[in-house]
Amino acid sequence: MTYQQPDAKGFYGKFGGQFVPETLMTAVIELDKAYREAKEDSSFQAELDDLLKNYVGRETPLYHAKRLTDHIGGAQIYLKREDLNHTGAHKINNALGQVLLAKRMGKKKIIAETGAGQHGVATATAAALFDMDCTIYVGEEDVKRQALNVFRMELLGAKVFSVTDGSRVLKDAVNAALRAWVAGIEDTHYIMGSALGPAPFPEIVRDFQSVIGREAKRQYAEISGGKLPDAVMACIGGGSNAIGMFYPFVNDKSVAMYGAEASGLGLDTEKHAATFAKGRPGILHGALMDVLQDAHGQIMEAFSISAGLDYPGVGPEHCYFNEIGRATYDSITDEEALEGFKLLSRLEGIIPALESSHAIALAQKVAAKMSPDQSLIVCLSGRGDKDVMQVKERFEAEAEGK
């Protein structure tokens, strides 16, 4: 049976939906209508395709990581090089698509949230390209962790708003951006950066990011004589690079799908972002999904060395995949991710983002259990330039025995 999700009300099984205040329903309905029309308009897709090719630099390579493969001694590992996109990550695929959509809707202002800063940079980039006013909401903790990306956003002409509410991280930035959207509904479009939020956001983000999996599928077929890979893999916070990799393979039952979530300091601590391992269904940011919550239903703080993965929920389509067993989600600690970061840098000369390093760490475990005639495609969602100073300080502190 062909996979057809979400349903007409934006649900993936029991997950998803539109749990938003009345003040936002108008905007959500307007966005849904505009998106359906854009999908049917070949000129919209043609303009986006042109930008992806000539501005972003797509398609990105599918790279056979031979030294990493030899080191692990199992499946052949291929890297889908989203780190080579303009702005350094997969986020630009969605940001450009949504800015085009905003322009089509006659909006003048763009707002967005960001954690690792990559979505903020991508949104500020797209807004600069289309001469649109842009404000990015960033948790105060992430402003410190990602100072370089904050400067990039400002350089691109965006206003950066430091969010001091709550734990001052990604979920708080989303809250602030949603409030700003309510206040400026007439002329403002909110660009959700991950496959989260009220419908139609998870579907929009999935569709714009599916270019990752579509390209990877075709590229692998070209080098393998028309075959499918045995498995695909990606890191998962909210889940946009993962859904972009998974969705084009969802009907190919022979292809296993693996997501690497962040278990921070460990599942036996409260310092993690392992929503599938430790969460349960709840409503957050306009959708029903698995979330980290205490016994009273209060949203808990997520924790990860990676600013892009410390979100206390995960997109509704991933929740559905997890429930029906279509994808397998495993947890990777900070230490394991740092080992993945070092390993890829030293074996392949590619410095990955800390987010992507979680996928590299999981690839080591999964590939080792596979045979050399099998293949695994890992989405290398972003490059590690933004994380180098943070990792340097971490390694120096460890060397000093702190």
From Swiss-Prot:
Listed CDD domains: Trp-synth_B
Entries under InterPro entries matching the protein: Trp_synth_b_CS (IPR006653), Trp_synth_beta (IPR006654), Trp_synth_beta/beta-like (IPR023026), TrpB-like_PALP (IPR001926), TrpB-like_PALP_sf (IPR036052)
Pathway entry: Amino-acid biosynthesis; L-tryptophan biosynthesis; L-tryptophan from chorismate: step 5/5
Database matches in PROSITE patterns: TRP_SYNTHASE_BETA (PS00168)
Coiled-coil segments on the chain, per record: none
Cofactor: pyridoxal 5'-phosphate
Keywords tagged on the record: Amino-acid biosynthesis, Aromatic amino acid biosynthesis, Lyase, Pyridoxal phosphate, Tryptophan biosynthesis
One Pfam family of this chain: PALP
Entry EC no(s): 4.2.1.20
Chain positions found as N6-(pyridoxal phosphate)lysine: K91
GO cellular component term, pick one: cytoplasm
Catalytic activity: (1S,2R)-1-C-(indol-3-yl)glycerol 3-phosphate + L-serine = D-glyceraldehyde 3-phosphate + L-tryptophan + H2O
Role according to the record: The beta subunit is responsible for the synthesis of L-tryptophan from indole and L-serine.
Family statement drawn from the similarity comment of this UniProt entry: Belongs to the TrpB family.
Known partners and oligomeric status: Tetramer of two alpha and two beta chains.
PANTHER family: TRYPTOPHAN SYNTHASE, TRYPTOPHAN SYNTHASE-RELATED
Protein name per the record: Tryptophan synthase beta chain
Protein source organism: Streptococcus thermophilus (strain ATCC BAA-250 / LMG 18311)
Lineage of origin: Bacteria, Bacillati, Bacillota, Bacilli, Lactobacillales
Gene from which the chain derives: trpB
